Amino acid sequence: MKTNQVNDRWIVQFRKGIFELAILSLLRSKPMYGYELTSSLKTTSALAISEGAIYPILKRMTEKGWIEFFWEDSLDGPKRKYYKMTQKGEEMLKERLEKYLETHQALLSLSGDLL
């Protein structure tokens, strides 16, 4: 397997985990629908995601019990599917953010002045 393919796969998996953390972080403040989540993530270029890419992540997070959804009427169109974080999601977010920050700090100390 070529190095670029390995790097690409690693980046894809890394971003999936980051998107889960970002989505849960956004849902801590209020329930949001898919397009609203996508728009909020796009405000930070490193977290920009397409609408088509966010829905499989939301489905997976729902299946894991980290988020749940409900339908609500919209003033300007069909009903919207809102997502909200569960208690399990809150616990998972806290655990993973702590682990992420711990790992991030360790990597920074190892990389020295590389960045």
Curated annotation (Swiss-Prot):
DNA-binding found in the keyword field: yes
Keywords attached to this entry: DNA-binding
Keyword Nuclease among UniProt keywords: no
GO MF annotation list: DNA binding
UniProt cross-references to InterPro entries, sorted A to Z: Metal_resp_DNA-bind_regulator (IPR052509), Tscrpt_reg_PadR_N (IPR005149), WH-like_DNA-bd_sf (IPR036388), WH_DNA-bd_sf (IPR036390)
Pfam families documented for this protein: PadR (PF03551)
SUPFAM superfamilies, A to Z: Winged helix' DNA-binding domain
Protein name: Putative DNA-binding protein YizB
